[in-house]
Amino acid sequence: MLMIRQRTTARPEWDAELELSLEARSKSRLRCFTTAGEDVGLFLERGQPPLADGDFLLADDGRLVRVRARPERLLHVACANAFELTRAAYHLGNRHVALQIGDGWLRLLDDYVLEDMLRQLGARVETVEAPFQPEHGAYGGGHHHSHGGEAEFSYAPKLHQFGVRK
């Protein structure tokens, strides 16, 4: 089994590829297979953003592995104007939907309830098969459950500071 424990910088060449769905790219622990069929064990640092299309991983044996986003069934959303597209994005964000944002369009994982809501808002919705690369959040860091305070964890950039006023 090819063991992978760390991310690395992009390179012009690689030894193997993983083609993974968003769900698989979001996991820090995963058993999967390279596109050539080799068994892989991912043991990545927890709390990091999902792997993105084009990311590189370094295997324990020194091989470089490139990540590809697997095409998934998505809803492609377009609207008549920027206001309607912004309104659609607002309603999807209010439901904490993973969302890919393009120039004049939105994409999300196929969901018939959300598709119906978007159509009621006046959006044009079509189903497409494409790699899904949603935004991973405004804070740029991964999700964490740190109880050790700021010395152990901090968001960058710090947008606000909570605490008792003195």
Swiss-Prot record:
Annotated Gene3D superfamilies: Urease metallochaperone UreE, N-terminal domain, UreE, C-terminal domain
Cysteine disulfide partners in this protein: none
Annotated HAMAP family: UreE (MF_00822)
GO molecular function, one term: unfolded protein binding
Chaperone listed as a keyword: yes
This protein's GO CC annotations: cytoplasm
Domain of life: Bacteria
InterPro entries attached to this UniProt entry: UreE, UreE_C_dom, UreE_N, UreE_N_sf
GO process terms (BP): protein folding; protein-containing complex assembly; urea metabolic process
Pfam family, one: UreE_C
Main location: cytoplasm
Subcellular location(s) of the protein: Cytoplasm
Protein name (database record): Urease accessory protein UreE
Keywords of this entry: Chaperone, Cytoplasm, Nickel
Gene responsible for this protein: ureE
Family per record: Belongs to the UreE family.
Record's function text: Involved in urease metallocenter assembly. Binds nickel. Probably functions as a nickel donor during metallocenter assembly.
